[in-house]
Amino acid sequence: MPLFPKCFASLRLRAFALGCCFFFAACAPVGETFRATAIPQLTNAPVYTDTPTWTPTLTPSPTLTPTLTPSPTLTPTWTPSPTLTPSPSPTQPLWTLTPPSNEGAPAASELGGAAFSNVTGWSCDDFPCGDDIDGWLRRIQVPQGYHAEHVGQFPGQPMQITYGRDGRLYATVLENGTRNGAIYVMNEDGSTERYAGDFVSPFGLAFQPGTDTLYVSARVTLEEGGGVWRVDPDGTITPVISDLPCCFMTIDNQPNGLIFGADGYLYVGVGALSDHGENSTRSADGVVNLQANEASVLRIQPHTGDYLIYAQGIRNPVDLALDSTGTLYSTDSGLLTGFGNRLLRLQANAHFGFPYWRDRGCNECWIKPAIIETLPDLVGLPPMSLPRGVVVYTGDQYPQNLFDNLFITLWNGVEEGQRVVRIDPDAVNNPEYAPEPFITGLIRPIDITVAPDGSLVVVDYVYGHVWRVVYDG
């Protein structure tokens, strides 16, 4: 479309608008003047201005009613409960021994040695038969003023004996001709019963003082390893030590006799693993390297099994004894050639010579190096006699001068064996001193102990007979 017509149409619209204005003006009434009338103002009405002015309205503050602020609610923070590690049970106290006394014992009396029986003419050749009690009582000899009684018989071969708090006699016993065995107990009427087992080659036994808890030495196996076991009153058997040296011979040289010392510790004798150290080597200073803990007496904490060497240089400490002052004694079975049977008075950290016996007549033994200091024997015992059990007399039945004397069983069937001998420790310094026979006529006496009534009780290995020696006065 041409531009001109658009412009022309616009002009026409403007002209129309102007015409309408003139029309309304012409139609107004004649003579009246048009006036603006003010809008009446409302009383107390607010006045509005172009820019509003803010007039603050005071709103009264609310009356504060105190509200108790609640105590903060403690939301526990979760802390994991600690894992309870049981505190170790307090170590049980060691029961120490009350020193024995001979108060009330008979007055001192001279003691003559036991006589010797005829060795022939019995029901079974050299000795009475096992069940010939009358024959045995005729054969067994004791000093004047004493007499022997038959107490009972253990089955099998007893090794060592001790009394319990119940007044009964307990023994380690080999069963059925083997090295296996158990603990047996002999009642007051002489009957026996099996108390605890099984053990391999059970040997020593000792009650912890003031308790019915029994400790037993034995082997772990027949040919290797020795140890100590605890037997609780309910029959539970628990190993205390199971790594001790063992076993030179089938029936010997293993963990042997047991005894509780005055300090409450348990002592055990441990035999050597050789006859005279021939399988050992020497260090540069000449000391023979024996296996750890062999040929020694060990001191054991009975509750934990911790132990150390108390004394050493003892080839085969078979049994231990304790006197009224707390001094320990040990028997020692010597070499297979017969040399070295002796009684020793033990001291802490002492060395008693084995295997350095070249200067004592053993040509196969080692020479003692200068670095080793040894203590002498208390008493030498007859060659090949094989001392086994030993006890210190601490009862009050025998005369007072026998208190703290030692009684030793000489086991072997040699001229000066098969008997119990008495040793007075106060007389041994006399160069002419010799042990005195106290019980003769036995076949294989293996152990001896003091009974609750103060008599001495000895047990024989072959038939298991138990004999009591009573003082008549």
Protein language model features and the residues they cover:
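Ser/Thr-rich, Proline-interspersed low-complexity disordered segments
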Residues: 27-118
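Beta-propeller domain segments
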Residues: 99-144, 272-308, 315-316, 320-436, ...
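Hydrophobic core register within WD40 beta-propeller blades
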Residues: 161, 205, 258, 317-320, ...
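Residue position within the beta-strands of beta-propeller blades
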Residues: 170-172, 215-217, 267-269, 330-331, ...
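Blade-loop segments of beta-propeller domains
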Residues: 181-210, 214
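Asp-box/WD-like beta-propeller blade repeats and closely related beta-sheet repeat scaffolds
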Residues: 201-202, 222-260
